[in-house]
Design a protein with these regions (language model features):
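Short, positively biased Gly/Pro-containing turn/loop motifs at secondary-structure boundaries
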Residues: 164-165
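Short, structured beta-strand segments at or near domain termini in extracellular proteins/domains
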Residues: 172-183
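Functional-site microenvironments in short loops/helix caps that host divalent-cation chemistry
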Residues: 1-161, 170
Length: 183
C-alpha cells in the first residue's frame, strides 16, 4: 500500500468487490453469514446511541483519544494540510483497537480507514430505505464508504461523513469491516 503495515493494522487497498468476495468466502468457510454492513447499520454502530457529530461528542480536539486521523503527527511528517489540533502518534494507519471504543464497545469507527458499506451511492441520504436495508438504487457503479481514515481532516471526522468510490477502486485509505447476520 505504499506505507508500513503490520498484522495488527487494518486491511487496505481492497475494493468493494474484494470486500464482498471475502465476505462470501468467509461465509462459505464458516457456515455463518458475513456481509458488508448497510450504510444505516454502519452509522448506527458508529454513533452508538449518540446524537453528536462524533461518538465522543462535538469537539474534534478529542479525536486523538478515539481515532487515528490527520493530526499533528501527520502534519509534522508532511508539513502541509489541514489537521486536528492533537497528536495521536500515527501518521499512517494505526494498529486496530488502539483508541478508546465507542459506547457499544466498537473500536476505530472513525479514522484509520474508510470502510465500505453495501449501499449504492446517492448524493443525499434523505429518502434512504429503512434501517438495515441497503440502498440498492442510485449510482451503483459508485459505492459508499464511511468513517474517514488516517488522512481525514477535522470536518470529515464525524459519524455522518460519507464518501464514494467505484466498486473496483483500491487505495491506501480504504478497507472494510464485516457484519454478521444471525438467523
Amino acid at each position: 500500500p505504499g506505507l508500513a503495515q503490520a498484522d495488527s493494522h487494518p486491511v487496505l487497498c481492497v475494493s468493494w468487490n474484494d470486500a464482498r468476495a471475502y465476505a462470501q468466502w468467509l461465509s462459505k468457510r464458516t457456515g455463518k453469514r458475513y456481509r458488508l454492513p448497510t450504510e444505516s447499520e454502519w452509522e448506527y454502530a458508529a454513533r452508538a446511541g449518540s446524537v453528536t457529530a462524533r461518538y465522543w461528542g462535538d469537539d474534534p480536539v478529542q479525536a486523538c483519544r478515539f481515532a487515528n486521523v490527520a493530526d499533528q503527527s501527520r502534519f509534522q511528517t508532511w508539513g502541509f494540510g489541514q489537521k486536528h489540533e492533537c497528536t495521536d502518534g500515527h501518521y499512517f494507519t494505526a494498529p486496530a483497537g488502539g483508541y478508546s471504543p465507542n459506547r457499544f464497545g466498537l473500536y476505530d469507527m472513525l479514522g484509520n480507514v474508510w470502510e465500505w458499506t453495501e449501499d449504492c451511492w446517492n448524493a443525499s441520504y434523505a429518502g434512504a430505505p429503512a434501517v438495515a436495508t441497503a440502498w440498492l438504487s442510485g449510482d451503483c457503479a459508485q459505492r459508499v464508504s464511511r468513517g474517514g481514515s488516517w488522512s481525514t481532516v477535522p470536518r470529515y471526522a464525524r459519524s455522518a461523513a460519507r464518501n464514494k468510490n467505484p466498486a473496483d477502486h483500491r487505495d491506501n485509505l480504504t478497507g472494510f469491516r464485516l457484519a454478521r447476520t444471525f438467523e
